[in-house]
Curated annotation (Swiss-Prot):
It comes from the Bacteria. Signal peptide: none annotated. Belongs to the peptidase A8 family. GO terms for biological process: proteolysis. This protein specifically catalyzes the removal of signal peptides from prolipoproteins. GO terms for cellular component: plasma membrane. The active site is at D123, D141. The keyword Cell inner membrane applies. Its main location: membrane. The gene is lspA. It is found in: Cell inner membrane. Keywords: Aspartyl protease, Cell inner membrane, Cell membrane, Hydrolase, Membrane, Protease, Transmembrane, Transmembrane helix. It comes from Shewanella sediminis (strain HAW-EB3). This is Lipoprotein signal peptidase.
Length: 176
């Protein structure tokens, strides 16, 4: 474990701040410039469409009656805390996991602020093909998904250099 925060994954916390600010600024822009369900076509497959999401990803539990706000608040705080602890224990050089954790934290905190401030999450990125629309989402959702993807990727490939060093250290310890 790194002896100080400067040598740990906490040095990557600037990503949390960047994701959080980009998410909140973009949502504030949507709230200022769009009416609910207003849509502006930008590309043949992409709209800005202001929608409110009272649930989680893909509007999961959006019709649950309000208790889900507190469940998702607890989950966001818990995951952000756990990932921050893990960042503190990781060396700075483990870039893939540090980036992944900070993307997830930034996204979780961005959506957490929406839930606490509005009671819902502001979504506006609307991709579609012909008449089939993917669930609208936001920058925080994107960061969470990219972070989760990096965690999954790292579980398969990891940092080969670090794994080989750990393997050599294990072999040296076994010889002694």
């Amino acid at each position: 474990m790194p002896t100080n925060w400067k040598d740990s994954g906490l040095r990557w916390y600037w990503v949390v701040v960047l994701v959080f600010i980009a998410d909140q600024v973009s949502k504030q822009w949507v709230l200022t410039n769009f009416e609910l369900h207003e849509s502006v076509n930008l590309l043949p497959f992409f709209n800005f469409t202001y929608v409110r999401n009272y649930g989680a990803a893909f509007s999961f539990l959006s019709d649950a009656g309000g208790w889900q706000k507190w469940l998702f608040t607890f989950i966001a705080v818990a995951f952000s805390t756990i990932l921050t602890i893990w960042l503190r224990k990781q060396p700075t050089k483990v870039w893939r996991l540090n980036l992944a954790y900070t993307l997830v934290i930034g996204g979780a905190l961005g959506n957490l602020i929406d839930r606490l401030q509005h009671g819902y999450v502001v979504d506006f990125l609307d991709f579609f093909w012909n008449t089939s629309h993917f669930a609208a989402f936001n920058i925080a959702d994107s960061a969470i998904c990219i972070g989760a993807g990096l965690i999954i990727l790292d579980s398969f490939i990891g940092d080969d250099k670090e794994k080989s060093q750990n393997g050599q250290n294990d072999n040296n310890a076994a010889k002694e």
